[in-house]
A protein has these predicted regions:
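Substrate/ligand-engaging "lid" and interaction regions
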Residues: 1-347, 351
């Protein structure tokens, strides 16, 4: 989806009235596979050694940060990486640590490592993964202690937290056909060997939020001009908890489970069902009683937008079946915080 299209992609914003707002995304200068045995590795190392590099962002899903299995055992790829050192990394966290080691060797210029995955405390997850590899290498004598000291210096390396929100379903056949009807060619939707659907276009809703901890030791682009919120870590966490625990994800999961049971094929269709709409409105109302306001985003306005604009949008090809995946793992995060705060609220004595 990069080289055959001259590194260009097409963003298709899907409006509720059926209008497709199309924009060419031309911000990718080169696509390089992070494979230490592949032809792109030398170029990727060169990019990471460049003093002008300000940040590296990650969108690898929450599972991409995991170094252990459900039993707590180190994954085979990570175990091999820890023993082999920074010259032959395979796991994403080891690859990130290896590239940082190359930057350290080239002068140790500052950099921000920014996770933009949709999970709680994403910057912490990235930092822990990188440090797990680096510390294993240091214990084995494969990297000097000075590398760990450099990684630990927040004037040199940071791992900002972020909250990201934009419903972006799998590439849609309907969108593909609409683009082909306009004369665009080679809009093929492909499936990778891991099962991910990819295409030269991305279809998404119009709403978007990105809240970033402002911790960039080598400077940063003026992303606030594009609507990005910059703030401190505590506010990022409040915004993330607001979304994940109250204003969006719990409602999504409720619709997903009932949508599967009642054989719905879209979230928008569920929102046209009076009973299901009342269900998520009630869940939202309960959450609003205890949610902590992050200040930069209004929980009430956020939830009103979700219920009245985002979920009912019939143009979004989002299915309850997609959202229902891994529900058992999501329940503690999406409902646990609100339930815990509600119990505390109930147990507090009423003041006269």
């Amino acid at each position: 989806v990069y080289e055959p299209y001259d590194e260009l992609s097409l963003l298709v914003r899907m409006h509720a009235d059926g209008f497709y707002d199309k924009e060419v995304v031309a911000s990718v200068a080169g696509g390089y596979k992070a494979d230490c045995a592949g032809p792109d590795w030398a170029r990727l190392v060169q990019v990471f050694q460049n003093p002008s590099l300000q940040l590296a962002s990650f969108t690898i899903t929450e599972k991409g940060y995991a170094l252990t299995d459900l039993a707590g055992e180190t994954l085979p790829a990570a175990r091999q990486d820890f023993a082999a050192g920074p010259d032959a990394p395979r796991h994403t966290m080891s690859i990130a640590a290896a590239l940082l080691y190359r930057r350290f060797q080239a002068g140790g210029h500052p950099i921000a490592m920014v996770s933009m995955d949709n999970c709680a405390q994403n910057g912490k997850k990235l930092r822990e993964g990188v440090f797990a590899a680096a510390e294993a290498w240091e214990r084995a004598g494969l990297v000097p202690a000075a590398f760990l000291a450099w990684l630990s210096d927040e004037k040199k390396v940071t791992f900002p937290w972020s909250m990201i929100d934009k419903i972006t379903p799998h590439p849609s056949e309907q969108v593909k056909k609409a683009l082909e009807d306009l004369g665009l060619q080679d809009m093929t939707i492909s499936r990778t060997n891991t099962g991910t659907l990819i295409a030269p276009f991305v279809n998404a809703e119009t709403t978007e939020y990105l809240v970033l901890e402002d911790a960039f030791p080598n400077g940063r682009p003026p992303l606030e001009r594009a609507g990005v919120y910059f703030t401190d870590r505590a506010t990022v966490e409040k915004a993330e908890k607001m979304k994940v625990g109250t204003c969006l994800n719990p409602l999504h999961t409720a619709l997903a489970v009932y949508g599967c049971l009642l054989d719905y094929s879209s979230i928008a269709a569920e929102m046209a069902d009076p009973d299901l709409k009342a269900l998520v409105e009630h869940i939202a109302a309960e959450g609003l009683k205890v949610v902590e306001d992050p200040g930069i985003l209004s929980p009430r306005k956020f939830i009103d937008e979700v219920l009245n604009e985002r979920f009912p949008n019939p143009a979004i090809p989002d299915t309850p079946q997609r959202i229902a995946a891994d529900t058992s793992q999501k329940l503690p995060v999406r409902y646990g915080g609100t339930l815990q705060l509600s119990l505390i609220h109930i147990s507090e004595p009423t003041r006269p």
